[in-house]
Amino acid sequence: MSASGASYAASGVDIEAGDRAVALMRAAVSKTAGPEVIGGIGGFAGLFDASRLAMMRRPLLATSTDGVGTKVVIAQRMGSYGTIGIDLVGMVVDDLVVCGAEPLFMTDYIVCGKVVPERVAEIVGGIAEGCVLAGCALIGGETAEHPGHFGPDEFDLAGAATGVVEADSLLGPGQVKVGDVVLGLASSGLHSNGFSLVRQILDDADLDLDAELAELGSPLGAELATPTRIYARDCLALAQACQVHAFAHITGGGLAANVARVLPPDADALLNRASWTPPPVFGMLAGRGSVDSDEMEHVFNMGVGMTAVVAPADADKAIGLLTQRGVLAWPLGEIADGSGRAELTGRHHERS
């Protein structure tokens, strides 16, 4: 090819930069690997030794795929990329654990306008940290460079995870009974939902991410970037120790809509707002954006990141176990006769 001819590098794709990113992320990824992981990163496929599944009576493989939505824009604006990968793991594995499945391994996909090796490695480092928190291996991934489609500082990411659960330990609507107690597990904040609305509120109110807001007590950007809490190990420990009938991961659609997904057609969940006070970030967004309460509850988790439906005899034990594990939990409501709906009643207590 002549010096003036077309080339992949001239089109904006830097293969060498991708190779450098892989080299920089290698140590972080290796920390997620247990003895089941065969080989390291760089192969065409990730390999996982599933021999122990042969000891299970009827193993069911479970899979989940998700992303972090437009929370990536917050990371891009702040130039901080170390925790957005934790968000990704939380969104994926905590959907997986809802059915009682133990996460085994995860893969990721990062697409960007320009591969900056240090930035990609920082993102993957967060994914690896999240996998350690979740107890699963990061066995593969892809970094794609899309010049002209994404700006040089823009990126998106997604991931998929696979887990396993015994068929007779499967959680969900079939196990939920009238009289069960619904426990709320506190979120770490917004998690990774509703950020398109968040950004609209910030833009309309002309708020910068470095703004110090009295109602938050911390810089706005730091509050918004707080990583999603990963509940996987806590939920699995709870299911081992207590009569858990269902979990619900509170993501897009809010508390009521997600709890309704794990209800049988002849039962309702009655959820009491007076049982908890949403963290200040939710009140800040509602006030600064003039967002009504119905919209807030439909978009955001409002301080409840996961729910557990447990047998009433085990409710106190479950709360105690979660407390020991550092997860704030409380009785949020109960299961009653009904038609498969979740209903929020009462009013939140005002924050003192």
Question: At which residue positions do the language-model features occur?
Answer:
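Glycine-/charge-enriched secondary-structure boundary and capping motifs
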Residues: 3-10, 27, 119-137, 150-157, ...
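Residue-level signature of catalytic and energy-coupling elements of molecular machines
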Residues: 14, 66, 179, 249, ...
